[in-house]
Amino acid sequence: MKTTVLTILFALCCIGQLIAVDVPRSEYPRPQFERESWINLNGEWDYTFDFVNTGKEKKYHQATSFDGKIIVPFCPESKLSGVEHKDFINHIWYHRTIDIPQTWDKKQILLNFGAVYYTSEIYIDGKFAGRHFGGSSSFSIDITPYVKPGAQHHLVVKASSDLRSGMQGAGKQSLRVYSAGCNYTRTTGIWQTVWMEAVDYKGLKSAQVLTDIDQSQIVIHPQFYNEGKAMLKVLLKDGKKIVATSEVPASNQTIIVLPVKKAKLWSPASPFLYDLTYQVVDEEGNVIDEVNSYVGMRKVHVEGNKIYLNNKPYYQRLVLDQGFYPDGIWTAPSDEALRKDIELSMEAGFNGARLHQKVFEERYYYWADKLGYITWGEAPSWGMDANSVEVARNFIVEWSELVRRDRNHPSLLIWTPMNEEWWPDRVQYPRFTADLYDLTKSLDPTRPINDASGGVHIKTDIWTMHNYEQDPAKLKEVIYKDGKFFQTPNNIQGAAGRNLGFNDPLITDEYNFPVYDGKMPFLIDEVGGIKWVKDQDKVNAGGSWGYGEAPKSEKEFIERLKGQIRVILELKDQVWGYCYTQLTDVEQEQNGIFYYDRTPKFDLKLIHEIFSQHPEESDK
């Protein structure tokens, strides 16, 4: 018995060493569904490029090493990867060895990827173990049949990307060789944490958590890897105090209802989170799986032309955050960097962010939940042909995975599947967009949907527009004039480009795209974008990019910014929120409140005074 205990302790120490602080991004990547027994696979891997896709013929999947070295989870385009290859990468192969602890015997062994752009194939000792389509969603591969506890194995990952095909969402990755305008350095391959974990065969696979503040209860829909003779015990805690508990059969048909007396609600002003523990218990009373989580009780809904949070009108003062980093591109250099971006935004006076053309990692949402920071979830839809049936097939599958992954986060208020779709056809696009809306509602009926931010709306809960008019007086007239709202220009495929203008559609064909009717919230979710750089000569030489003509002085910048926000707030009866472009500069696009290195451009107290203003009726 003593020998067994020592063996277990030794194995746990080994696991602890594998997740030591010298491993990049060593923190647990999924804080809302956390297990104790896991191994972080970040760090140095081997790699090789495969530009002409002959790697399979060359038996790369059977490799035991490659010549190149790369630091995972940073993409090969980034400085932190140690590679910095900036040109297009169609295919890349990764390799490393993995050691399976003996203590994982008789467990299901899962290989988890935070994200790999875009498609991936997984091999263990040369044997195909699984594949995944989609560059932003997390996925797991059950490698139990391919590994042996106590043994070492070779793990090979092939990642492929074809950005210029139009068949995959690129987000803000440049489709040109170099960054240009509002498109930046690409991300290929592994760009989020890779880890292994051991789970009992009857373990908990997922749990959808719905909070009902009107009836003061939490409803949980659990799913298990395999159903059997086991029970699920759920504990809801406020600190160390157990607030509610339930024990039910471990069945996929089970619905758990936890009454919460005197519930503490989550809001930006008071971001309270309950701790939530799941325990799967076998017939002998042993805990065979335990997952630690948390939940924030809050409600978001649309009523008339306003968005409500916890049954009160809530005005959103958002900033556009594209989630790029100078040294990591799509990958934050540290967990602290994720938190710091949120804190900088709040210091500047914003109460949330529209997370733009990138799926942010789960730890970002964790910090948003903890700090009380509103977010909008968005897919990197730019670069894909939204009129293509194949694109619809690819996108719908990945979008489903994203909604399931992030739907339990209280900070996430709005779903935005697509951005600025301005070139619709009259058949596929309306169907695709409406299907996306219906699919999202079926997966998450609790949140409003912004179907195509600033673009051609088809089926949506809120109406959004983008406009970068720099003159405040003109901006006000552009948004709303003579009782009419501006509609984003739509360029219909197969017809001359026509501006729908104010809400008098000029298209007289059989099918007219919808226009705003005043019966839902109207938000300007891209505005501002005022360019400012330290070096005015760089502006004059065209070395920076932004919207409109750059101000000549700091005073001119501040006055323009004040004016833009003032006129939007004056339209509070028509416009229920805004999103300012943007939080930080990104490469050559230099219109952030902060520089790319996160240093402030102006006195933050002054900036905070501007962006912290709110109209009446708004929850402070």
Task: Go through the PLM ranges and name each one.
Residues 20-82, 158, 162-167, 239:
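Accessory carbohydrate-binding/adhesion or oligomerization-edge regions at the termini
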Residues 33-57, 116, 182, 186-189, ...:
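Substrate-binding clefts and catalytic carboxylate motifs of secreted carbohydrate-active enzymes
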Residues 118, 123, 132-145, 164-177, ...:
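Active-site mouth of glycoside hydrolases
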Residues 1-22:
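Bacterial Sec-dependent N-terminal signal peptides
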Residues 429, 453-481, 532, 536, ...:
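Substrate-binding cleft/loops of secretory-pathway carbohydrate-active enzymes
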Residues 198-227, 614-620:
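Surface beta-strand/loop "capping" patches
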Residues 31-32, 47-50, 85, 89-203, ...:
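Accessory beta-strand-rich segments of carbohydrate-active enzymes
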Residues 122-124, 217-249, 254-256, 276:
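Beta-strand-rich binding/interaction modules
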